[in-house]
């Protein structure tokens, strides 16, 4: 890839058509937010100003809005201003396909046409296939990266991008978003940035290649920093884990989560929101509990409308519908109906 680095694409970022496309993407699901409405008041003027700043190199990202989310787990989110969201979409519109071109085939995050549901379906089919061949003697290495986004090294990431991209204007923009992390150290990229999602996927592509091309891992599936490898023997899984830990520490400056483990296929594996078994898959228990908490909150606190509860349940049942969960969905449907009925009596 280094022999054919991408060049002469910077001007594509600031075309009128690309900036308007970026604006439309940035406002998706946020049309009535104050920041979106404020930017839209003088849409033409704001896009022209952004266009000029990016072109002459004076553009700098603004201050993050920092807040916490608590589901599926507690995380600090640093969200960029709306105009920066537009600029990031404009950048990714142009460079995204070049970055994704080098992704490992079974890497499922941030890739159009893939995603968590496909990752789950592919793993489920392979689980069933290997269980049919080898019975219970299939070994699983289930791993993820400890504090992944907060541990990404800026120097390593910039070097990776420079193996793909030659265009100095594009690299300058990428570096701006990498360096603007809300911290005083060159480590970590903010989860709230659109660019961070695709950069984080780029970052682990070196690990994908190492596991597949050097260690010859036969079956590997990754969704962002969460990955699963399947082996015929425990010894193979242990060797892979040992070498992966060394590679991550020395080359990518990352550590595996202490919960990383090796076990037999019959125990099932948690991946992309489901627990997979050789002949079926279930919704994870924490997902069920989160939906139950929303129902209890609706019943007890009164700070959630029926429409909000139904929207949350619709999203959850869509996720649950990709598992063997018909009875579970029926039970949860009755709970939601009961909760709404109690409030309307």
Segments from the language model and where they lie:
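PAPS/PAP-binding and catalytic site of the sulfotransferase fold
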Residues: 90-94, 241-244, 248
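Short, conserved aromatic-histidine micro-motifs
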Residues: 57-61, 217-223, 291-305
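Right-hand nucleic-acid polymerase module
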Residues: 80, 89, 180, 185, ...
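Conserved polymerase palm-domain catalytic core
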Residues: 46, 53-54, 106, 121, ...
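A general alpha-helix detector
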Residues: 5, 156-160, 226, 294, ...
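Conserved two-metal-ion catalytic palm core of "right-hand" nucleic acid polymerases
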Residues: 1-157, 182
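Active-site catalytic microenvironments for nucleophilic, acid-base chemistry
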Residues: 94-98, 206, 210, 247
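Intrinsically disordered, low-complexity and often Lys/Arg-enriched segments
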Residues: 1-12, 246, 337-345
